[in-house]
Amino acid sequence: MIISKTPVRVSFFGGGTDYPDYFKIYGGSVLSTTIDKYIYITVMKTNVFSDFKYRISYSRLETCKTLEEIEHPVVRAAIQHMNIPYGLEINIISDLPARTGIGSSSSFTVGLLHALYALTGKMVSKKQLAEEAIYIEQVLLQERVGVQDQLAAAYGSLNHMIFRENNLQVNPVIISKERKKLLESNLMMFYTGLSRYASVILEEQVKKTQDKTINTELKDIRDMVDEGLSILCDTDKDINQFGTLLHKGWMKKKTLSSAISNNFLDEIYEKAMNAGAIGGKLLGAGGGGFFVFFVPPQKQDEVRAALSDLNEVGFGFEDDGTRIIHIS
């Protein structure tokens, strides 16, 4: 039995510039961190006495006699991609709900590949895991996804990612533990109660990207990455500026697509801001999932009270990325 443990991520700035339609022409950039919320995947060879070849347990249970019968698209594509001839039992457990803007779909793809490679006795690099996850999602499954989530899941930590046509870079953000802890202590996360398929939200945005009608907005969003880095790396700068920039980024992001926000989500944001948040954003493509807010510690109880009808999720940063935590 193999167990992989793969983190999800919080993206601060640059989202939308990690789609090939944009970065292959203009270049993209993202500032993000992985957090201590994980997807756990166990894989093992099917017992020879079983009356099925594949058993996959997630929000539902699949038992299949052929690969083609598997309905979970990533599981089917990953097994096919790796050309694994024998049967498999796969169990998936997640700390947080799926389809909520934290990159969990790509964390799953990366974690599954990692576990399957370990089962076959192969050690693979973080770079290979990320690249193969991107290949599975973008090429084999033809999903409308970017590249930041796969890289975050594989590498882990607080990173500045740079995207070019033939080059995806992951650069660790070099700041002191104290500065990193200061950022972490000012962040709060709340679940809106809404989940959604990012591909549906992204249809309008991707079309606008292809039509080049949001180039100015995407350039502004990309430029915020450098601004965010400057705030983090210059200890003379007030960390609250990071929150102000988050607010600026969220206002800009909402112009990319009419599906990113709605009245319900706008009301949540307004409540948090009125209670003391300096800025925030809806994670991922938008339309639901998790809000992250930048809130000075002395104001956090007030924000908590204002959003008492939502579930708060406490979290911390993590530095490891995907890893194998059990082999037997």
Predicted regions and their residues:
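DPxDG-like acidic metal-binding loop motif
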Residues: 102-126, 154
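Short glycine/proline-enriched turns and hinge-like loops at secondary-structure junctions
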Residues: 23-25, 103-104, 144-145
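Short pre-catalytic strand/loop immediately N-terminal to key active-site residues, enriched for Gly-Thr
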Residues: 94-100, 278
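Glycine-rich active-site/cofactor-binding loop and its immediate structural neighborhood
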Residues: 288
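C-terminal nucleotide
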Residues: 1-13, 18-21, 30-32, 38-84, ...
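Conserved catalytic cysteine-centered active-site region
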Residues: 84-91
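Short, solvent-exposed loop/turn segments at secondary-structure boundaries
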Residues: 67-69, 101-104
